[in-house]
Amino acid sequence: WLFHPERPFWQVPEAKIGTEYTASKLNGELSESSNKLRLFSSYAGEGKEGLTYAQAARWLLSVNGYDDTSAKPKGKDLPSVGAGWLGKLGYIQAQGNNLFETLMLNLTLLQDGVKLWGENQPCWELDEPHSAERTEIALPDNPAQLLTLQSRRLLLNREGETVTGFSLLGGDFFPRENAFAEQMTVWRDPDAKKSKKIGQVTFVPSRHDPAKQFWREFPSVFCEEGESVRKPGVVRWVEMLQNDPDCPLERKRLIRFAISGMKYGDKDFFVNDSFSDSLTFQAALLGELGRRWTVPIRDEIGRCERAAQYVGRLAWELSLAAGDKNDTTAESARTQFYFTIDQPFRLWLQSIDPETDKLDEKADEWQEKARKLAAELGRQMVERAGNAAFVGHRVEVKTGGKKDEKKTVLYTAPKAYNSFLYDLRKLYPKKEGGTA
């Protein structure tokens, strides 16, 4: 079926006129273009020049979903299709304990948990397969059509038993605005001010930031929906399952949500890297019992963001005190702070039992942990700052006035550290009987 003369699997014969690529571009572990080789490649020599049929079939699906925008159209005045549909998403899926559970958790029998789907029609059941280049279609109204969307027209090339490359044209696409048939993406309002002004919100898929831990996205994925927040369809579906008394999804069962995506270069012209992350917590957090927990969790994540800013400011002031003006100092310190609290926060979130735990006690538990971790990181930063930072340096800074007036400020390590501890204690007040 991979090389059927009329209907090859996930391909169209008409794609033979498209842009030609080698097997190293098809191989998702390389995604290597002809004019830009990977420096540290997992394949070399003949291993880069060809793929087995099994490998090619797998990567065929990958390039269809995640292809970049480097291919040139063959026709004139054709619209831009952008990256492959999956590459445009902030992809998210629920994961069970085995393949069957994973399939069932992601098989949203109702669109967004409330709306019936249309009749399923995968691309291979069409009377006439789509073959025209860069074709705008209506938003699919059934999951089969969406899951088999041909973002690219593809045709494999082979020599004997080896796939040596492929030809590619732009395929089907539809506007991403309010494309709510897509159940496995995070959403965002790209212009909240305009939406508020006209009283109408437009949502688009929100790509994940590979530099940002998934738990930091918790408010936009799992919290209550509002004017500018819309939950992914698969999250709504699992919520519905959790609230159904006849559903076998036990409250205390741990459920995992995983995200993945591609990091593209300028204008999605090439793939820089791929990434993935996951988050585990009790299924009850998505049910009625968990509603009262989402706001406290969101608040703690917000406090983490502010603590990161305090750590970054401490690093910046320490660098000024030492006579250094490295612009990356603050960002590096914030990254280090998030790395420090990453696993502790995941474990705290996973430990929450909405049925038996008390909100205040769990919040206090995390705040004490976060305060200790931030304070220890700050102490280490001060120790590494050196003697010059303890003596300090005078630095000219702008006063913020209209005439760009400046004043001289003395930055020292003790002064910066005391200010940091003051802010930290305000953010995480020490509870009676607590330590640190």
Located regions from the model:
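The −1 position to Zn-ligating cysteines in a subset of zinc-ribbon hairpins
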Residues: 48-51, 153
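Cys/His-coordinated zinc-binding microdomains
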Residues: 53-56
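Extended alpha-helical scaffolding segments
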Residues: 1-35, 62-436
